[in-house]
UniProtKB/Swiss-Prot annotation:
The gene is TBP1. The 26S proteasome is involved in the ATP-dependent degradation of ubiquitinated proteins. The regulatory (or ATPase) complex confers ATP dependency and substrate specificity to the 26S complex. Residues 1-21 are annotated as: Disordered. It comes from Oryza sativa subsp. japonica (Rice). This is 26S proteasome regulatory subunit 6A homolog. Keywords: ATP-binding, Cytoplasm, Nucleotide-binding, Nucleus, Proteasome. ATP binds at residues 217-224. One of its GO terms (cellular component) is cytoplasm. GO terms for biological process: proteasome-mediated ubiquitin-dependent protein catabolic process. Its main location: cytoplasm. InterPro entries: 26S_Proteasome_ATPase (IPR050221), AAA+_ATPase (IPR003593), AAA_lid_3 (IPR041569), ATPase_AAA_core (IPR003959), ATPase_AAA_CS (IPR003960), NA-bd_OB-fold (IPR012340), P-loop_NTPase (IPR027417), Prot_ATP_ID_OB_2nd (IPR032501).
């Protein structure tokens, strides 16, 4: 048989000792000991009853306080901003007996300086219902209208125009929809997509990926299409800005839009910001007496700061597109901001044939159509004009009530687009 554990053995030894003691005690001693035990039991029962009553009273107080909190938390709140969070550490001073003590001055812990939407600046020694560790300067909070106690934290405030920049629906374009730009696709993927999907490969080599990419080239060569395809291939948030959208009437409004856009991108990182027609704000700086020009320059300076300032974030990538790279400011073009410049030239003959095939793949095309010959006939055409050729060919087939598009339709479409390309339009007021 195994021996009992030490605790059980000790308990058995105590019981044996008690039995021996009881056997040696007289009847009067046993009666006296029983009375003492009864008294102790009665005292413990009274203490238990008193403790239960205290617990019940505390529960009632908690319930009352929760009701008061519910009353205080009734909407609407007053909106305020945290200006500063302070640590309260009062010096211990010997107080005389009977001296009045200022409780606020003796508080320890965190307190807050608050600025409300009514333009009041308020010091709060007691923060309220929000954990002080979760607060930071600049946070938006809801406070009580009378006591100014912080009742709840509110989501960050962004300009409604910036919220509208977020692309909710993923673009449907694919890299297969882009013809003749294989080198440009590879450069864009290396600079934008790979740092987001394979960050460890850059860390192993010890290199920092580019912060931004500039797509430049003549109009209609596929710059915006490439950016949309890039957005479709990544799971990142995609913000689309237009350069003219950042030029605002009021001073500081354009810079605030840029700031808010990057702040929203930081919150929703990883994120890609696409700025189309960046030449609207990124032109070379010059001395001007016109306040509008200076405001445009201020907007560009804010963009430079966000790209390469103290608050820049590696999880935010910028794609900028322009067809006038020659007028952009050198500070915007320097390395460290828009590191990689990708040129989009007019498509070559092989690329033109591929673009015509891409745009006509959903059309009912006659098998005799020779795209290589059509590509030779479309010298100096860009991608947009080649798409127009396919549309014109389809319209001509529709005019003939044909069921398929022939080679002659494409030839006629080329002639029509070429005529529009060469004709000069004059507008008169």
């Amino acid at each position: 048989m195994s021996s009992p554990p030490p605790a059980a053995a000790a308990a058995m030894a105590v019981d044996d000792a008690d039995d021996d003691q009881l056997a040696s005690m007289s009847t009067e001693d046993i009666v006296r000991a029983t009375r003492l035990l009864d008294n102790e039991t009665r005292v413990l029962k009274d203490e238990l009853q008193r403790t239960n009553l205290e617990v019940e009273s505390y529960k009632e107080k908690i319930k009352e306080n929760q009701e008061k909190i519910k009353l205080n938390k009734q909407l609407p709140y007053l909106v305020g901003n945290i200006v500063e969070i302070l640590e309260m550490n009062p010096e211990d001073e010997a107080e005389e007996d009977g001296a009045n003590i200022d409780l606020d001055s003796q508080r320890k812990g965190k307190c807050v300086v608050l600025k409300t939407s009514t333009r009041q600046t308020i010091f709060l020694p007691v923060i309220g219902l929000v954990d002080p560790e979760k607060l930071k300067p600049g946070d938006l909070v809801g406070v009580n209208k009378d006591s100014y106690l912080i009742l709840d934290t509110l989501p960050s405030e962004y300009d409604s125009r910036v919220k509208a920049m977020e692309v909710d629906e993923k673009p449907t374009e694919d890299y297969n929809d882009i013809g003749g730009l294989e080198k440009q696709i590879q450069e864009l993927v290396e600079a934008i997509v790979l740092p987001m999907t394979h960050k460890d490969r850059f860390q192993k080599l010890g290199i920092r990926p580019p912060k931004g990419v500039l797509l430049y080239g003549p109009p209609g060569t596929g710059k915006t299409l490439m950016a949309r395809a890039c957005a479709a291939q990544t799971n990142a948030t995609f913000l689309k800005l237009a350069g003219p959208q950042l030029v605002q009437m009021f001073i500081g409004d354009g810079a605030k839009l840029v700031r808010d856009a990057f702040q929203l991108a930081k919150e929703k990182s990883p994120c890609i910001i696409f700025i189309d027609e960046i030449d609207a704000i990124g032109t070379k700086r010059f001395d001007s007496e016109v306040s509008g020009d200076r405001e445009v320059q201020r907007t560009m300076l804010e963009l430079l700061n966000q790209l390469d300032g103290f608050s820049s974030d590696e999880r935010i990538k910028v794609i900028a597109a322009t067809n006038r790279a020659d007028i952009l400011d050198p500070a915007l073009m320097r390395s460290g901001r828009l590191d990689r410049k990708i040129e989009f030239p007019h498509p070559s003959e092989e690329a033109r044939a591929r673009i015509l095939q891409i745009h006509s793949r959903k059309m009912n095309v006659n098998p005799d159509v020779n795209f290589e010959e059509l590509a030779r006939s479309t010298d100096d055409f860009n991608g947009a004009q080649l798409k127009a050729v396919c549309v014109e060919a389809g319209m001509l087939a529709l005019r003939r009530d044909a069921t398929e598009v022939t080679h002659e339709d494409f030839n006629e479409g080329i002639i029509q687009v070429q005529a529009k390309k060469k004709s000069s339009l004059n507008y008169y007021a």
